[in-house]
Amino acid sequence: MLQPNFRRFEPSYSWKSREKSTENRGFLSRMCGIKQKMNKYNCRGKYQETNDQNLMQDSGYSLKIISSGDEQITIVYTSRLGKMKDLQVPEIEISGVLLERLEACNYRLDELFIDLKASKCICSSNELLNIPKIIVRRLFLKMESLEMLEWWIERVDPNSLNELCIAPHGEYPLDIPSKIFDLPHFQNCKTLSIMEHCSFSTDQFLALCIAIPNFSFYSDRIDENIVAHAIKKRLSLNDQFVVLEWFFTKHVNVEKVTGDLKCTNYDRKERFDVKTECFEPVDVYSVPDENNKKTSLLVLKDSTDNFKPYNIVAFS
């Protein structure tokens, strides 16, 4: 676990003043029109969902597993017929109840949302050890331990994933080692948001940048030159570049990222009205490629002045 000088992040932009907003919309959503979802147990910030004509047909099932204190776990199960009554289950009984729910939906889910404290009851369960791979479109994990994080990822069919979001469970992020990024789940999804600290290798990072249309990550291991190279790689591809977002707490030389990319003549209001955004100040650069396809590069700064800058976003 990272020490207190590191900051906990939520993906996709907290409001400076939520009570003044009448909409549950986040920063990039308002600029790019990316669809968002909010719900009672949302711990993933405001994740981004892209449209894909080839996505697996909706199963109509969702499952949420949430630590609720006093060694109890809440299970929220929704089927085609609507939401069932929430279950409060003792931690030691969770394996049997979970197996029953998975069998009821034939191991096919639209959404699997898991927010759990460290526990051996699931990871060491013989009942769950050899279950079929869970076919799920959207997987959201908020785990207290790396062991549980890896265990749950490996229970999921990597070929079915459209979105994967990993959020910190406690006050400070875990440090995800490079070996976890070798799992195929990270390469196959369309949207990947990791707000635990990513200690991937340069090669792993570049591979993710090329493979994933919407990629948000927190890392102080990746340097400015590598991020600049990743943006150039994405711009050189023929497919639609969507979002690459880098959160960090270390000092970053923004010019190393933007120097070869930004245009001298750019219009701050070309894509949105700066005055309505969440963070101040915001630097915006318009980056056309050789085919004149426009991409925007944002540098966001924390309004509390604790971190300058806060993150860098490239999107089209």
UniProtKB/Swiss-Prot annotation:
Source organism per UniProt: Caenorhabditis elegans
Protein name in UniProt: Uncharacterized protein K06H7.1
Domain of life where this protein originates: Eukaryota
Organism ancestry: Eukaryota, Metazoa, Ecdysozoa, Nematoda, Chromadorea
InterPro entries: She-1-like (IPR042317)
